[in-house]
Amino acid sequence: MVFSDLFFLFVFLPLFMLCYMLSNVCDKQLRPNSTNKTAVRNATLVVFSLIFYAWGEPMYVFLMIISVFINYLVGIGIERQEKHRKFALIIGLICNLLILGTFKYAGFFAEVLCSVGLTVPIPKISLPIGISFYTFQSISYLIDVYRRQASSQRRFVDLLLYVSMFPQLIAGPIVRYDLVAKEINDRHITRHDVVEGSYRFFIGLGKKVILANQFSEIANQFLQGELSGLTMQGAWVGIIAFTLQIFFDFSGYSDMAIGLGRCLGFHFAENFDHPYCSRSITEFWRKWHMSLGSFFRDYVYIPLGGNRRHQALNIFVVWFLTGMWHGASWNFIIWGVYFGIIVTLEKYTLLKVIRYIPRVVLHLYSLLLIIIGWGIFYFTDFTHMQRFFLSLFG
């Protein structure tokens, strides 16, 4: 089920909002002095979130519940076992990465081993929807508890709510636990929240249905197939259409998630900030999928040493992982390394002289490299990718 489905818009969402508003009344009337002032609302949201997820993944909903239960136990262990809290964190991280690796990357790694002459059975495992997002949120929870930036969640249902919340479960943004921990147990919904949230949701829906879907048709018209007859003009039209499609699609889903969250009393962080207006690739990645960027910055880049030591290596690791996170395919790895190289070069060259370069030149420079990056991102077949770039540059 996706937000643009008619069933979601005219059946699921109205029914959920009705039940949620009734549960809000129950919380106010039945639990005015409780320490958990959102118990009924949380239970309602969890039930509908599991239905939402099970609609497309009836079996994998149990995988998500098991994953949450493991993190629930590990989180409590980190907080209670002072002497072994680091060991508990490591166990939790390994469990999360094993689940993600098994379902997302096992087939890819098996194919790589087969390509170098080893005989390895290639598992046929379908990818659970949203597993990359909810795995990273689970990791965020464990690390925030370990760093004492948040307390462990003592109610399993509330942790399940954090991980499975349907507004951001499928396509983000990645919600940091320390930013919503208080709202899980105590949040208030005002008329202003509902109005602003609804407006944001419909803006996102318009981006997806009116703009992204149309640009998708244009991109597919030029970039699908064997590409043997693709002209330079066709290549540019196709990749520019895809550049616009992926922005309106992804930012549209983020707008809908943020808007729905606002209607429910949650304040999710922004995920996009006019990224195509950037004057460098470094700036672009501060404005594109901001929740993923902040995750890698705070949980990978800075712990590795950040700007203090081995900066180039740290950047490479982050961008290699960024590429892997987007998909189990070589083109995504190349795409990540491509941007990692550019960001590294910018730190040592462009960013030191950027104020002397005309803005229009910087914008054109950034857009060109972004478009080339989306070309790498689009094609999983290297033959098609080669034909595309040969056509793109004549």
Where on the chain are the PLM-derived regions?
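Membrane-embedded transmembrane alpha-helical bundles that form the catalytic cores
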Residues: M1-G394
